[in-house]
Amino acid sequence: MIKRRILLIGGNYSPEPTGIGKYNGEMIKWLAEQGNDCTVVTTYPYYPEWKVQSSYGKQCFWYKTETQIVKNGNPIKVIRCPHFVPKNPSGLNRMISEFSFFFSAYLVMMLLLFKKKYNQVITVAPPFEMGLLGILYKKIRGGEFIYHIQDLQIDAARDLAIIKSKVIINIFLSIEKFILSHADIVSTISVGMIKKVRNKCQKEVLFFPNWVDVNTFYPVANRHDLKPNYGFDTTDKIILYSGAIGNKQGLEAILYCAKSLQNRKDIKFAICGSGPYKANLIHLKEKLNLKNVFFLPLQPIKTFNSFLNVADIHLVLQKSGAGDLVMPSKLSTILSVGGVAIVTASKGTSLYEVISSGNMGILVEPDNEKALLDAIINSVDSELKEHSENARLYAEKNLSAYKILDDFFSVVFKVERNQVKSSIGELRAKIA
C-alpha cells in the first residue's frame, strides 16, 4: 500500500471503550500499521460516561498533543481539543457540546492548513457538522474528503423528538446536504442507511460496516463456569444488556420484563454500561423493588470476551423511531462470541434483514413489551445451539476487522475517481 498522509476529524476516539470512539481508534491504528502517516483531531475521551476520563485531569481545558505508537513503530499524532461535556446530555446540551468541539477543532485546522498536505481527510458523523472542516481543507489544500456516517444523527433527533424545533432540524438538514454534496466519498454502516443517505445526496454511497476482531471475541467452552466470577450461580439464566444507556434504546422495558419474571428465581437480568439514563433506570429498579436486576460497570477489555460469554441471552434494543437511522454497534461483538440475541427491529430494516437471513437471533417488534417478555421466556428454556453457531459463522464471514478495513480502503485509495466508481460493485460483493 502506498504511504499516504491521512487526517481524521472525529468527536470520539480511543481510549473510549465503546461506540464510535472505539471504531475510530481501531481504524486509524490499522491505517498506521499499513504504513500510513496518520493524524487525528478529536476531543478528550468522555463517552459513554459523559465525563472526561480522570487520567486527563485538568488537561482537558486546553489543547494537548499525544503520540501513539503502533506495533510496526509508526506514530499516530493525536490532537485533543477542549470541548463542553454536559452532565445532562439533553438535545440542547448535545448541540452545545458538538459545536464547542467544532470551534476548537476549527482553530487546529487553521494551523494544519499550513502544514504538509494530507491525501485524505476523513470525518465521521456524528458530529455531522465536522464535515464542514473536511470541506474547508479540501477547498484550500485539496485532497480527498471522505464522509463516513455512523448514525443519521439529525433524522434520529427529529424522529425521537430529541430536538423538537422544526427550524433547527431544517437548518441542520441543509448543512448536512451541503456536506454530502461536497464529499468525494460517502459511506455508512448498513444497507438501510445507504438507501436513506442516497436519497439525501443522489450519489453513490459505499458500504463500510462496523467490524469485530474475531480472534479477540470468540465462544468459550463451559461458559456456565464463568458465571460465579460475576456473582451469579452456574445454573442462573443470564439476560444481558451491555452497551450505552441512552434514550434511543428504551431500556425501561427490561425492568418491566424483570418485574413479570420475579417468580423465576433462575432468571437474572444484568445491565452493563454507562450513559445519561443509567440513574433513571436505577431509580426505576428501586421503585419496582426488583431483586433480579443487577447493574454492572463497563468491563475491562481484557476480560470482556469472558463477560459476554456469561450471557444466555443478549438484548439488542432500540425504539421504533430509530429504525434504519442507527445500527447497534454492540451486535457485531455479540455475534462474534456466538451470542444469541433478542433484537427489537421492524420488518424492512437492515437490522431485521441481517438477523432473519442468518437465523441467528430472535426478532421482536420495537416498543412491544409483551412480545419482548414472551421472547425472553421462550428463549431461556429453548435449545439455541444452532442460533449460536450461525452467529459465530456470520461474524467470521462478514464482520472480520481486517477484511472490512482492507476491502474498504482498497477502494478508497484508488488514485483516479473513475477507478473508485468502478470498484463500488466489487466492494459491495465482498462485504455484503
PLM regions with names:
Residues 1-66, 424-432:
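N-terminal subdomain of nucleotide-sugar transferases
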Residues 36, 212-229, 250, 414:
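Acidic anion/phosphate-binding donor-loop and adjacent secondary structure
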Residues 56-63, 218-232, 388:
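A short helix/loop element that forms part of the nucleotide-sugar donor recognition site in Leloir-type
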Residues 110, 129-132, 136-140, 167-186:
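Membrane-proximal helix-turn-helix segments that form the acceptor-binding/catalytic region
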Residues 189-192, 211:
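Carbohydrate-associated surface elements
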Residues 249, 297-307, 312-335, 341-353:
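Nucleotide-sugar-dependent
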Residues 270-273, 278-305:
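Nucleotide-activated donor-binding/catalytic signature segment of Leloir-type glycosyltransferases, i.e.
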Residues 367, 385-412:
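A charged, aromatic-enriched C-terminal amphipathic alpha-helix characteristic of glycosyltransferases
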